[in-house]
């Protein structure tokens, strides 16, 4: 895909619709190489938000929640598009973004936020800022009941989950599993299991293809 975009900028030679059908542009993070441009049609946006909303709902987000979204809004799908998946649950979404951690702590206190959407490493940053800038305040005092995590590894460690429950008093969930150039969020955990539920079966059909023959191969566990 990267080679196709380099040869046929900016979207490659594999777009499934005319350029004028695209209404939103995102880019991948580029952490493993050249960032890729992602073009979404209005229908792409709607389907992506619906599937991601299922994931957030399965992880426990409800219309009664106020959730602060603390991922990067600068072109990455984790920002605006994940924001819209949170909103699809009926929850009130606070579009905070990254940085300004002191302001985030005050915002959580003042607005009555009940859930946070962020990377698994961000609670440690919050803990440090609370300890340094808010004497007498503990993470539990913020009243967050639910942590919706994605964008990084680490949440599969049972000890880390246990620590989040103990220090924050919130339930940690892997709520945001996806691949930007397919769906930004198509799998999530629920309250009963730490494994991921696949939430896009009606719109995304996974296949394993032999690159030489183009023939489908059987999917096996292992």
Predicted features and spans:
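Adenylate-forming
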Residues: 123-142, 158-165
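AMP-binding/adenylate-forming
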Residues: 41-55, 66-125
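Conserved helix-loop-beta element of the AMP-binding
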Residues: 66-68, 133-155
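Beta-strand-connecting loops/turns
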Residues: 64-65, 222
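Nucleotide 5′-phosphate-binding alpha/beta core
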Residues: 1-27, 33-50, 54-58, 62-64
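Conserved AMP-binding/adenylate-forming
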Residues: 149, 154-222
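Conserved S/T- and glycine-rich ATP-binding loop of Class I adenylate-forming
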Residues: 28-31, 67, 116, 178
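Glycine-rich helix-loop-beta junction characteristic of Rossmann-like nucleotide cofactor-binding loops
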Residues: 57-61, 85, 139
């Amino acid at each position: 895909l990267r080679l196709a975009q380099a040869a046929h900028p900016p979207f490659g030679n594999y777009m499934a619709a005319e350029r004028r059908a695209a209404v939103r542009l995102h880019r991948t993070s580029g952490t493993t190489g050249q960032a890729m441009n992602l073009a979404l049609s209005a229908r792409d946006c709607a389907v992506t938000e619906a599937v991601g909303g299922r994931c957030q709902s399965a992880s426990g987000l409800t219309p009664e929640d106020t959730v602060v979204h603390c991922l990067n809004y600068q072109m990455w799908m984790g920002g605006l598009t994940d924001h819209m998946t949170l909103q699809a649950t009926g929850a009130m979404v606070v579009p905070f973004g990254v940085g300004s951690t002191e302001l985030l702590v005050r915002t959580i206190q003042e607005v009555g936020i009940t859930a946070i959407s962020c990377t698994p490493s961000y609670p440690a940053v919050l803990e440090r800022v609370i300890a340094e800038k808010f004497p007498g305040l503990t993470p539990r005092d913020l009243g967050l009941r639910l942590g919706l995590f994605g964008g990084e590894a680490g949440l599969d460690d049972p000890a880390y989950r246990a620590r989040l429950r103990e220090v924050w008093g919130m339930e940690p969930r892997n709520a945001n599993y996806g691949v930007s150039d397919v769906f930004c969020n198509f799998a999530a955990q629920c309250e009963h299991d730490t494994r991921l539920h696949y939430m896009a079966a009606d719109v995304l059909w996974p296949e394993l293809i032999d690159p030489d023959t183009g023939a489908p191969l059987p999917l096996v566990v292992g």
